Design a protein with these regions (language model features):
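Structural beta-sheet core signal
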Residues: 150, 208-209, 242
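Conserved catalytic cysteine-centered active-site region
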Residues: 93, 98-100, 121, 152-205, ...
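Structural signature of cysteine-dependent C-C bond-forming condensing enzymes
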Residues: 1-4, 132-146, 171-176, 199-209, ...
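Short glycine-rich or small-residue beta-strand-to-loop segments that form or flank ligand, phosphate
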Residues: 145-153
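Hydrophobic pocket-lining "lid/loop/helix" segments that shape and contact the acyl-thioester
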Residues: 42-69, 76-87, 91-93, 97-104, ...
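Terminal signal-anchor or tail-anchor transmembrane helices
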Residues: 1-40
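Solvent-exposed alpha-helices and their adjacent loops that cap or buttress functional pockets
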Residues: 36-37, 141, 170-172, 184, ...
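Hydrophobic alpha-helical cores of multi-pass transmembrane domains in eukaryotic membrane proteins
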Residues: 19-25, 153-154, 211, 234-236
Length: 301
């Protein structure tokens, strides 16, 4: 039988053999590439931590009533209509009755604008605090972290917030540090996607992702009702996550990250202009949200 097959093969036209090989080789290469692509490095969530101010923190919890009373008493630039509107939003916001505010907002007589130093202190207290909690929770050595990604949409300073993390925890010299800003509420999720992509390329590595916002530098003091939402919905807070692709962590991981899907709608003028960081007619800086946000968000989902 083998002899017959060999004889048939020897009698084939060499040009025909070449043609067949040319036809099937790309298909074989494509099949191999597809199989190899499917063998991406799995990425897992080792653990996470959410920030809560410690007893000695300068940050304080205020009730909704305290927030409104402060706005009436010390918000010299707020009109009665603005404070009444804030009170209605707070009642329907879904936030708990006690939420945390930075030192610049809880002092007896807040000053406007607050200093950059106070804003930096808020970010450092939140970021350093939540990272310390996460490292203690996971018993991870900071030197083992190979990737650091920090997200803060509205506060961008030099040195960057990610550089502050590297300096504070004395991370290693080859750590890959990224600072993400201006991405709004999707920034944290985009950072998770970035961490996943990096971990699929760099083997045996831990990625630290931190997401927060800064209130000290972004409290709106004007009377444009479309810009008052920041004061009502945003509070002091932050979250830190450790993602891993290390096989040694498999017995401790909580979840596997299967997919990270981003929908980019900035090419749409409607979406692009739905949220803006800008100054109002009186020069007060804040976040303006218009009615197109709901439409844009619905299309993205």
């Amino acid at each position: 039988m083998n002899h017959m097959i060999l004889e048939i093969f020897n009698n084939l036209n060499p040009y025909l053999i070449t043609l067949v090989l040319l036809l099937i080789t790309p298909k074989i290469v494509t099949l191999i590439f597809t199989k190899l692509s499917a063998l991406t490095t799995p990425v897992f969530l080792l653990d996470f931590a959410c920030y809560k101010p410690k007893q000695d923190s300068t940050q304080r919890a205020l009730t909704r009533k305290m927030v409104v009373d402060k706005a009436r008493k010390y918000g010299l630039t707020y009109s009665k209509e603005t404070v009444d509107f804030m009170e209605k939003i707070l009642e329907r916001s879904g936030l708990g009755n006690e939420t945390y505010f930075p030192e610049a907002a809880v002092v007896d007589e807040p000053t406007y604008p607050p200093t950059m130093q106070k804003a930096v202190e808020e970010s450092q207290e939140v970021i350093f605090g939540v990272v310390e909690d996460l490292l203690a929770k996971t018993k991870v050595n900071a030197k083992d972290i190979g990737i650091v990604i920090v997200n803060c949409s509205l506060f961008n300073v030099v040195p960057s917030l990610s550089a502050m993390v590297v300096n504070k925890f004395k991370l290693r010299d080859d750590v890959k540090a990224y600072n993400v800003s201006g991405m709004g509420c999707s920034g944290g999720l985009r950072c998770i996607g970035l961490a996943k992509n990096l971990l699929e390329v760099h083997k045996n590595m831990l990625a630290l992702v931190v997401s927060t916002e800064n209130l000290t530098d972004n409290c709106y003091m004007g009377n444009n009702l479309s810009m008052i939402g920041t004061n009502c919905y945003f509070r002091v807070g932050g979250a830190a996550m450790l993602l891993t692709n290390r096989s040694s962590d498999l017995s401790q991981v909580k979840y596997q990250l299967i997919h990270s899907i981003d929908i980019q709608t900035a090419s749409s003028d409607l979406s692009y202009s739905s949220i803006n960081h800008q100054e109002d007619e009186d020069g007060f800086r804040g976040i303006a949200v218009n009615k197109d946000l709901i439409v844009s968000a619905t299309e993205a989902i």
